[in-house]
């Protein structure tokens, strides 16, 4: 709607201007401070200029009123125009708020957890954010592909195999074992040990077979990770292996060398990242010739940046903050524009239950499992809460609040609005088709404002995507639900003289809730279950 209004205003004003959304919808639906910008040029007061501009909008179909207030030009949208938009939305509900196909393309890499165990609650935040960003981008018409980078090489995979071997020796073969300082523990390791013993037999469990054992376990863990994601309605397009990039390492090093991006010192090869804003240079090849994790990651990012996407986006844990300058430096040395590599950081999550810290999972040792939380509160509540705050801010929540059936539980509160609307239609014995001819002229000011808010979802979605600020969607839904409940409690609907106008208004509110929830990966309920 905002873009339509902007274009209508531009036809009359014939110049560029900023169009704002005032918080107080009783004051205006849209406003522009254009008069303040023109004051210096025209050598007149903003108040006079705003009055002159307002006079150009007399009898315009889109606007109920255009007023000059303290130098601002305030626009109120007409019921006739809002009704036209309502008809379009209700006639094609599946296309509501959808964007036209765009040429801009994105590659999002996210989750990319080591395949050494099930996903924990820290992984879940980036996973939910990435999946919702994907749904939103595609809805708005962008080309958007997703990828999971599987760290299937290096020490952590060997450590997985070693941990299973030691578990077999200790728990099944009853041998005395000495555990290293770092190893994987938890019931899932014991379960893998039992399964491996049944599959491979006693003779297999020796140090020389650790790589084979690790490979087998890594594949099992990747299946489990995909199941964890699926449980939260998350599907990633493709999984790429770190090992598949081994052969490209030498060519990448040559390219970095040509661009003076690396140098040798102390028997190691260093990335000269301090030249590009990093706090110091970084080792990418060790003294024994083995590449560091950074080396493999540079090769992978070089491949991603070479695939022709307009922008490559990564979602990383906040503990990777210091990793950003070195990766951007490497891309600059390789001839890429590092602005086309965008990093979104997912901050830590603190989980409570009845005000106390949530218990760690026995299955995973020191972590809270994503699957445990989904089992307890459902994927809808999990997704909502992870999207309720900006991704790079710390999130603390008490899962007990998400099990309440009152306004303190936002998922329940918003769903209750959606279900209430279905209930009202049932009580009136009507369907949406029965109210399509209603012209909405009888709506009072609160009704018009509620209709405007429901139709303004597209603006919220665009803002949320462009700013990568997905919390704008749940914020919008909370406000919409609150305004609906207030309006419903203050206005008689079934049996009123303007029943059809009110039902048509409500159907728009329901459509906005359903559309926004769908983009968040949440199902809007038609009936509340107690």
Residue ranges of predicted features:
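Non-catalytic interaction-recognition regions
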Residues: 1-83, 94, 98-530
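Short, charged, solvent-exposed linker or helix-capping segments at domain edges/interfaces
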Residues: 84-89
